[in-house]
UniProtKB/Swiss-Prot annotation:
Source organism of the structure: Shigella sonnei (strain Ss046)
PROSITE patterns: GATASE_TYPE_1, GMPS_ATP_PPASE
Residue ranges occupied by any Glutamine amidotransferase type-1 domain in the UniProt entry: 9-207
Binding site for ATP: 235-241
Quaternary data: Homodimer.
EC number: 6.3.5.2
Occurrences of domain GMPS ATP-PPase (ranges): 208-400
Pathway: Purine metabolism; GMP biosynthesis; GMP from XMP (L-Gln route): step 1/1
Pfam families assigned: GATase, GMP_synt_C, NAD_synthase
Protein name according to UniProt: GMP synthase [glutamine-hydrolyzing]
InterPro entries assigned to the protein according to its UniProt record, in alphabetical order: Class_I_gatase-like, GATASE, GMP_synth_C, GMP_synth_GATase, GMP_synthase, GMPS_ATP_PPase_dom, NAD/GMP_synthase, Rossmann-like_a/b/a_fold
Gene that encodes it: guaA
CDD domains, alphabetized: GATase1_GMP_Synthase, GMP_synthase_C
Amino acid sequence: MTENIHKHRILILDFGSQYTQLVARRVRELGVYCELWAWDVTEAQIRDFNPSGIILSGGPESTTEENSPRAPQYVFEAGVPVFGVCYGMQTMAMQLGGHVEASNEREFGYAQVEVVNDSALVRGIEDALTADGKPLLDVWMSHGDKVTAIPSDFVTVASTESCPFAIMANEEKRFYGVQFHPEVTHTRQGMRMLERFVRDICQCEALWTPAKIIDDAVARIREQVGDDKVILGLSGGVDSSVTAMLLHRAIGKNLTCVFVDNGLLRLNEAEQVLDMFGDHFGLNIVHVPAEDRFLSALAGENDPEAKRKIIGRVFVEVFDEEALKLEDVKWLAQGTIYPDVIESAASATGKAHVIKSHHNVGGLPKEMKMGLVEPLKELFKDEVRKIGLELGLPYDMLYRHPFPGPGLGVRVLGEVKKEYCDLLRRADAIFIEELRKADLYDKVSQAFTVFLPVRSVGVMGDGRKYDWVVSLRAVETIDFMTAHWARLPYDFLGRVSNRIINEVNGISRVVYDISGKPPATIEWE
């Protein structure tokens, strides 16, 4: 019998902050399971979840507006600790009898708060001391409204000159509010505050660890599928690879992995996937060479969104054909991860704006003939990588830069042709190889090459040539929501450009993309 790793759990209610998923990831890093739900949950749902504690997230709205979100009243009646962050603190204050006002100026950025009263939340935690020995905390503020009066049964724990109630607490009820973001790294002691709340105040044990997550997932897979056969589309990406390894550990040869080579992969990627999973790990793999079929379907198409849909559609067609050749397969496995689940829920409630169609879920058959197995659906990406390491997958593969689901289909601008893909593959491989050699690969968040369907004149020897252009792209980001272009050294860029132009016959010019996000997206299409 495996240990119940969900026994202690934190419920995070989402009021719309860009940092809310980061709060959840921080709680998981502390070894405690948590889930992220929309703020408008019912009392019955909270009772059913049975949390050890509740966190109210930040959000972009103003509590002073009539129809702004509120925490369900049951949150304050459930008898469990509650931690309000930024907007979460403001709605807590307002709902429990305090007062919030719109501020004339938004407070955004670094601040130092002075701890003026003892509290279990920050006891013994400090970044510095005042002249008279009071603890100071370096924090990150991001708010427009501010609490101007706290509820009568609360005390002020910390304040700044412009924010008199930076931390408030009701120790008896174990209610806490902070007017800053403990989840971001700029709040230097933020993790210690979250740990204090989750581990000490809520008394949650650290049961959520990679080894225990694997044991739990294996047990659940076996319970779900029994002796049935399972099919999985293996792409070689992190999610499908870790899904394959978990299923292989749980059901062995009852798993069949279908690897569709769409001709839109990186240099030598197909061979690497087959070698690693087939030869090294001994998984049962069906290799489907389908380059011609994908490129034929993409012929003449220039629109990025249409290209995505075509690639998704053809993959499903090819995958379905292979599935029909297998006998008695009753389950389809997918590498769905927790952010996909959150995103789908947000889309269903109309609370998210789709910028690009999601690569992973673009074209599932509307009428599933098989049951669905999703062993990663509770996990964030960083957790997937950690359990991948525990399962024996190589670090370099798990921590590779992101690669889009449509592959080179969205890195060749406009119409996708085999000639363009072949040139791009080789140019991109040189860029990545040089980044690794210069010890720059892990210093940037994502780097890749884009093929531009324009010819540019070049000089080779005594002659002129009229060949294609590629752009190098490298960005630095924490969350991929915003990004800065990477300031790579000029001599490095010169070396990469020289190698590409000299070694890849057909490319005459290399440019470097210096666009940030926003306004540009990270991928070109």
